[in-house]
A protein has these predicted regions:
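Generic structural signal for well-ordered, non-transmembrane alpha-helical segments
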Residues: 42, 49, 56, 82-85, ...
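Short, Lys/Arg-rich amphipathic alpha-helical interaction segments
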Residues: 97-134
Length: 144
């Protein structure tokens, strides 16, 4: 046999490892979901800004066409303005939904992490039990 024996993984070891990795993965998943939602919100805000700029330019074109008396250009500009206004309404609604989702996600993450504190206590209890066992096995060895 080799001088260094590989420690045997017991159910206590497994419980400690699993509870630790569960907490780690939960925290990571909560953070990632929040980051993804905030990226989406930023993307929507950027799209909305571009659409507002296009709408402003479209209204300027409409004014120019009206001043020049170009009916065809006016119709085209009005159609483009209508489409841009619909797009802006849609983006505004999606932003509102995303903000709501982010709020709910934050609450869910908080609740999940609060509930997971019990798992942390399980990990600590398993570690304590392993430490106590190690202390018991080292005392007889020291007495010899």
């Amino acid at each position: 046999m080799s001088a260094k024996q590989k420690p045997v993984n017991t159910p206590l070891h497994l419980l400690q490892q699993l509870s630790g990795s569960l907490l780690e993965h939960l925290e990571e998943a909560c953070s990632q979901a929040l980051a993804d939602a905030e990226k989406l919100l930023a993307k929507l805000e950027k799209q909305r800004g571009k659409a507002q700029e296009k709408l402003h330019n479209g209204r300027l074109k409409l004014q120019d066409a009206a001043k020049a008396g170009k009916a065809k250009a006016q119709t085209k500009a009005q159609k483009a303005i209508g489409e841009l206004e619909e797009l802006l309404d849609s983006l505004k609604e999606r932003q509102t939904q995303t903000r709501s989702y982010i709020q709910q996600l934050k609450r869910d993450a908080q609740d999940s992490l609060k509930l997971a504190q019990g798992v942390g206590k399980v990990r600590e209890a398993a570690a304590k039990a392993l430490d106590q066992r190690a202390a018991k096995t080292s005392k007889p060895a020291a007495a010899k």
